[in-house]
Amino acid sequence: GPMEDPLEIIRI
């Protein structure tokens, strides 16, 4: 997510 995890790139 845009402000959920540092790996938001993998989420969306």
Swiss-Prot record:
Protein name as catalogued: Conorfamide-Sr2
PTM annotation (Isoleucine amide): residues: 12
Keyword annotations from UniProtKB, A to Z: Amidation, Gamma-carboxyglutamic acid, Neurotoxin, Secreted, Toxin
Known role: In contrast to other conorfamides, this peptide does not show activity on human and mouse sensory neuron-specific G-protein coupled receptors MRGPRX1. In vivo, it causes hyperactivity when injected intracranially into mice, and when injected into the foot of the fresh water snail P.paludosa. It also causes paralysis when injected into the foot of the limpet P.opea. Has no effect when injected below the rear part of the dorsal fin of the fish L.reticulatus.
Annotated Gene Ontology cellular component terms: extracellular region
GO MF term list: toxin activity
Regions annotated as coiled coil: none
Modified residues (4-carboxyglutamate): 4, 8
Family (UniProt): Belongs to the FARP (FMRFamide related peptide) family.
Predominant place of localization: secreted
A GO biological process held by the record: venom-mediated paralysis in another organism
Localization in the cell: Secreted
Expression sites by tissue: Expressed by the venom duct.
Extra facts: The mature peptide does not contain cysteine residue.
